[in-house]
Regions:
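N-terminal signal peptide c-region/cleavage motif recognized by signal peptidases
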Residues: 13-15
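Buried hydrophobic residues that stabilize the cores of well-folded domains
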Residues: 19-278
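Positively charged n-region of N-terminal signal peptides that target proteins for export
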Residues: 1-5
Length: 278
């Protein structure tokens, strides 16, 4: 079970790394799509049951989601053990856009607000984080800029004083293919995005210091219904990648995640249990 929890922890920490287009634009749309699927299928509760590499049920990692179609909210409660619990609540507007999230744990609470332009394009993400004792507060803004309704630049502003500029390059189809951040005049290595013939994101690539070459950090495969059926995550500081394989039911709701390590050995799995009702 330790290896399974380590895999989950690695994925969570890896998901917070700086791929701004993927995290802000793609990730926010994924949350909206999940909530829309729950609403369309009258889902009101989801329980994620975890199993280790020996197919033994574990209560060390527990996730429960509660969806309210009336309030347009999705509350996700995650417990990694008896002492560590976090609650993430996401809110939608009438256009199915995520407009707010609150993420709270025993240590930190983060409130994030999202705004959109008249065309439904994300223009700002503003987050405020404070510790449980209210002794420290941090803020971060992501201000998205567009040129002819296509992504051009994003400003990341921390605590209203520290600004990083993230510039984007697009292909002929309008897909983001490169992002590069500049802070205090110093440019960071670029992140590259690759797509298939259907304009679906297939790879996110950056320079790997250990390998001394460009390597993918994410790789995606899709079903004919455009659902992600496999995701490979590769940490930037090593090559111990994880393979996540997904299964869905006929309504497009995720039913199972199976996780393998680099050696193709089963690390664990997660099964989804749905409850339905208005």
């Amino acid at each position: 079970m330790k290896s399974f929890l380590a895999a989950i922890a690695l994925f969570i920490s890896f998901s917070t790394s700086a791929q701004y287009y993927y995290q802000d634009i793609v990730g926010t749309k994924e949350t909206s799509a999940i909530m829309k699927a729950y609403r369309d299928n009258k889902v009101n509760r989801v329980v994620l049951n975890s199993y280790d590499e020996n197919n033994t049920r574990s209560n060390d990692f527990y996730v429960e989601q509660q969806f309210s179609a009336v309030n347009q909210t999705l509350k996700t409660t995650t417990r990694s053990d008896m002492d560590h619990e976090s609650v993430l609540t996401s809110y939608l507007d009438g256009n199915n856009n995520v407009i707010k999230t609150t993420d709270s744990s025993n240590i930190v609470t983060t409130v994030t607000n999202y705004t959109y332009n008249a065309d439904g394009m994300l223009v700002s993400i503003t987050s405020f984080s404070s510790d449980s004792a209210k002794r420290t507060t941090e803020s971060e803004q992501h201000l998205w800029q567009y040129n002819n309704n296509k992504i051009a630049r994003m400003l990341r502003i921390k605590n209203a004083t520290d600004t990083t500029y993230i510039d984007f390059k697009l292909d002929g189809a309008g897909n983001v293919i490169e992002e590069q951040e500049t802070r205090k005049g110093v440019k960071s290595p670029s992140i590259y995005y690759y797509y298939d013939n259907n304009n679906r994101l297939t790879d996110i690539v950056r320079y790997n210091n250990k390998a001394k070459r460009l390597l993918p950090e994410y790789m995606f495969e899709y079903s004919p219904a455009n659902l992600v059926i496999q995701k490979i995550t590769v940490p930037s500081n090593n090559d111990n990648y994880l393979i996540w394989r997904y299964q869905y039911n006929g309504q497009g709701l995720k039913t199972k995640e199976v996780i393998y390590n680099k050696q193709k050995e089963l690390t664990g799995k997660i099964e989804y249990q749905y409850s339905f009702g208005l």
